[in-house]
């Protein structure tokens, strides 16, 4: 059986984009070889369309954050704050750098916690 060619989407390999809000169109790089599978655009778009009426001013929790794209999308769309819980040290550092670029110095709407999400929730 012949393998079909992959579909070209026009996006750089290893990145996801913010769909809407103040950071619309900005990209988050995904480390090559990382064990991270970001939530696809279409799924995020549907999720945030459902949440749109209640999202502004809310506090969000992005568990198993990886790239942090869910929490960053929430911030972009008006959430007051997002906490990101990620166990992998490299992914947590990358997420802190992305938040620094997006939210800027002196803004602390995003907080990265390096922890196992289940243990962190258990308290």
PLM feature segments, named:
Residues 1-123:
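Class I S-adenosyl-L-methionine-dependent methyltransferase catalytic core
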